[in-house]
Each structure stands twice: as C-alpha cells, then as structure tokens.
Amino acid sequence: MAAPGEALTSSGYIAHHLSNLSLAKLGLVADEASFWNVHIDSLFFSWFTGLIFLGIFYKVAKRTTAGVPGKLQCAVEMIVEFVAENVKDTFHGRNPLIAPLALTIFCWVFLMNVMDLVPIDFLPYPAEHWLGIPYLKVVPSADVNITMAMALGVFALMIYYSIKVKGLGGFAKELALHPFNHPLMIPFNLLIEVVSLLAKPLSLGMRLFGNMFAGEVVFILCAAMLPWYLQWMGSLPWAIFHILVITIQAFVFMMLTIVYLSMAHEDSDH
C-alpha cells in the first residue's frame, strides 16, 4: 500500500485491490499463511449476502397471499420452482433436505457473485478514507477460502449420506471393489476411487473461485489502466457479460451439489 498522500501505481493499485483485510494485516496473526489468518472482509460479505437472502425469503414467506402476487413474490416463486424442478429431475432419492439446500446454495452463491458488479472503489474508497480500513475485498466467492469451505461442507454431506444410506461397510466396499470387482484389484480401486472422491470438492470450490477471481481481475484492470472518466467504457461491456457468468456459476455449483448428493444416496451393488 502506498504511503499516506502518495498515489498508487497501476501495479500497486491492482495488488492493493487483490488483498484481503485479514488478521495478519491487522497484526493479530504473525503470518499471512497461518491457518488462523481469517479474511475478515470475505466473512463479513458472505454473512451479509446470506442475511439478504434470508431477509428476502422471510419477507416473502410472511406476506405470501393467495391473490395476485407482487413482483418480489413472483420472482421468489420462479426461483423456488426452478430449483425444485432441477432437484426433481436430478435427485432420485428421498431426502427433504436436498431442495432447501439447493435453493440456499443457488441464491447465496448468486448474491456473493453479484458483489462483483459493485464498482471497484465504491466500497473500498470510503472504507479506507472514512473508516480507516486499509483493505477491502467485497466478493466473497473470489476468495478461495470461502469457496473451498462451501465445497468441503458439500463433501462432508456426501460422506455422511454415503455412510448413512450404504452403511460403513457398503461405503468401504464401494471404494475397494469399484470399478474392478476382484480382491487383487483393491489397491488400484482404492487409488482411483479416493482420488475421484477428493477431486469432487476440489473441482467444486476451485471452479467457482477461478471464474469469480478472473472476473474481479478484469474489473480491477479496467479501473487501473483507464482514467476514472473512461473506466465505464471498459467495465460496462464486461459487467453485462459477467451477469451471465455469475448466474451460470451459481447454477453449476448448485447442480454439482445435487448430483454429488444423488450419487451418495445411490445404493451400490458392488
């Protein structure tokens, strides 16, 4: 970060906007790489967007009428029906948790992604100059810690339901005797299945992070390389395209979650 009164260079501007407000930067943790180095801004905005989701759906649920619905109620009902149809088509088990979980994931990830459309300096500038907060990243899904935490949550549910539906022995048998149902192939099967199992949360979290981080970098580059009065020329076309990206990424995260949990509920014959 530049010294007080000193303007940031383009590279400094980019580095500054890609830095999280963390416990290490506040001097509360010794090292940025520490396990206990929490990214405060990512946590705050993930909670903030989660509360927005809860607030909107609670408001609609309290005011739902049998008559002519309002615009907000129509939008919420469309989202609920959209998610319910995808769960019905993809998930073939019986679990009342899956549809609410899929709805929560889709809406929450979408709202976190939407933060990428907030102008780059709209929140960091007043935070730094009025509140004394030196760093502020407002896109939680552009933080690998957030996306991997969500992916690990899905992974934990996968393991839980795999053991619950198939039993511990059935789950172990599925890992050991698939794809080759022969005792001599158990080490090879375990290698394949364990790698495949671990790749699911890794790809789930990294896919969302990679797409959102790349989008954030493009917005920052537009802001860093163009004068303030021309920044909209670079940012606006990308923002319009990015609306599609943030929606698709929320949908992909939701669908993969449904697919993985559906696989966990399948009773294997191996």
From Swiss-Prot:
Pfam family, one: ATP-synt_A
Function, in words: Key component of the proton channel; it plays a direct role in the translocation of protons across the membrane.
Molecular function GO terms recorded: proton-transporting ATP synthase activity, rotational mechanism
Record GO biological process: proton motive force-driven plasma membrane ATP synthesis
CDD domains linked to this entry: ATP-synt_Fo_a_6
Transmembrane residue ranges: 38-58, 98-118, 143-163, 208-228, 239-259
InterPro entries: ATP_syn_F0_a_bact/chloroplast, ATP_synth_F0_asu, ATP_synth_F0_asu_AS, F0_ATP_A_sf
Organismal lineage: Bacteria, Pseudomonadati, Pseudomonadota, Gammaproteobacteria, Vibrionales
Subunit and partners: F-type ATPases have 2 components, CF(1) - the catalytic core - and CF(0) - the membrane proton channel. CF(1) has five subunits: alpha(3), beta(3), gamma(1), delta(1), epsilon(1). CF(0) has three main subunits: a(1), b(2) and c(9-12). The alpha and beta chains form an alternating ring which encloses part of the gamma chain. CF(1) is attached to CF(0) by a central stalk formed by the gamma and epsilon chains, while a peripheral stalk is formed by the delta and b chains.
Record membrane topology: Multi-pass membrane protein
HAMAP family: ATP_synth_a_bact
Principal location: membrane
Keywords: ATP synthesis, Cell inner membrane, Cell membrane, CF(0), Hydrogen ion transport, Ion transport, Membrane, Transmembrane, Transmembrane helix, Transport
Subcellular location: Cell inner membrane
Provenance organism: Vibrio campbellii (strain ATCC BAA-1116)
GO CC annotations on file: plasma membrane; proton-transporting ATP synthase complex
Classification via Gene3D superfamilies: ATP synthase, F0 complex, subunit A
Superkingdom, taxonomy of origin: Bacteria
Name of the featured protein: ATP synthase subunit a 1
